[in-house]
Amino acid sequence: MERRRLRKDIRLNLYYPDWDSRANHTELYPQLRVITSQPIGHWFGSSPTKPTKRVKSRVHRLCRRAHPHQPIIVIYSIPNRDLGHYSRGGHKEEKSYLKFIREITAGIGDYNPIIIFEPDAIPHISNMKFEDGFRRLQLIKKSLQILQRCNGRVYVDMGNPKWLKPNQVKRYIDWINEPIDGFVVNTSNYWDLKTCHQWGDKVSRMVNLHYLIDTSRNGVGSLGTDDWCNPPNRALGVFPTTRTSSEYCEAYLWIKVPGESDGTLNGGPKAGRFFLEQALSLIENVGR
């Protein structure tokens, strides 16, 4: 199928949540409102202890509340998610996962959210057996076909700029061969803007698609490829905006929720749980 062409006229109208899910913390630490006042990704996925429920109604309610603005919806529930690591979980079988994708699609309908599709799912293929990786690619292709039925803008995650080589990304996108709106760089990671742009621009020219960068925690860059789990002394990055320094980059977004743990390293709680000390550190280190 023919992909959508590069669009230079894209305008994002991001949704700023009008509720404070961390009210108990912001009362004690008002500086946290720097984080809670921004348009941040809403993650939908299943875990071993928290299966997905009422997905269609939850997605629809979010989109209706946000309208005419665009919420950021992160789909994160592919089978064998995170290959059994800190964020392990996802759906147990492909059939239930595709049902989950159909429910999200139905919940979105004619609304136009920004959809971040499956952080790390494609990069992890490089760590899978051939048959398992091929099966995952087939599942991703089917999922993207379903998501075409809604009006959301779909961006497929391609990991951080030190994971896949640009030609690997091109092979994956060519194989999937579905009309997506772009790809995502640096989801839940810490790499600085210069590194992200160098990699993203190269990929963009190869695949003829624009990209987004997760800047939620990359204000002072990364400590290295192996230090991605709650590294100390990091900082919030550029606040969400469409004013980027690359013609190929549509926006800087906060896809990862700043202050949510990467896993149980460096003093952090389980992945996805609020990590107050990290949140305060991210704020304190801005501009250093």
Where are these regions (language model features)?
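Glycoside hydrolase catalytic-domain context in secreted enzymes
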Residues: 76-80, 114, 150, 163
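Structural preference for beta-strand elements that scaffold enzyme active sites
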Residues: 41, 68-74, 112-116, 153-155, ...
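N-terminal carbohydrate-binding/catalytic regions of secreted carbohydrate-active enzymes
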Residues: 2, 6-103, 107, 257-284
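Generic structural signal for well-ordered alpha-helices
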Residues: 59-63, 101-105, 140-144, 170, ...
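Active-site cleft segment of glycoside hydrolase catalytic domains centered on the general acid/base Glu
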Residues: 89-111, 119-151, 166-168
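Secondary-structure boundary elements
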Residues: 67-68, 106-114, 142-155, 174-180, ...
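Active-site-proximal beta-alpha loop/turn segments in soluble metabolic enzymes
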Residues: 82-87, 119-131, 154-160, 184-190
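Surface-exposed substrate-engagement region within the catalytic domains
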Residues: 2, 14-36, 161-276
